[in-house]
Amino acid sequence: MQTIEIGNKAELQACKFLHTQALEILAHNFKALPYGEIDIIALDKDTLIFIEVKYRSKTKFAQAEEMLTYSKQQKLVNSASIYLQHNPQYQDYQCRFDLIAINESNINWIKNAFGVI
């Protein structure tokens, strides 16, 4: 399976998991050029959540949680800013950056994975 297919499968798995947690999925793979994309954007009551999904099939050398770099965090913050510019109805919502780490078949949802840089 190619990297993109694996990533899409992990993101779909994350979306299904978030639905079981009563979150509303607003966007999937939101493109925010030139910064990249946000894997999942969800709404939990009055909190807008920008979610990065990381998957590791083998955890011998690193866990998925360790793959969220400082550079990626900066890109997510910038991408979130673009999302808010395009969706002003969410301007007054609280925002949060979460990580869903999938290691083999285990899902770890890390709320507030990092603060705004």
UniProtKB/Swiss-Prot annotation:
GO function term, MF aspect, one: nucleic acid binding
Pfam entry (one): UPF0102
InterPro entries, alphabetized: Restrct_endonuc-II-like, tRNA_endonuc-like_dom_sf, UPF0102_YraN-like
Family in the record: Belongs to the UPF0102 family.
Protein name (Swiss-Prot/TrEMBL): UPF0102 protein FTT_0898c
Organism: Francisella tularensis subsp. tularensis (strain SCHU S4 / Schu 4)
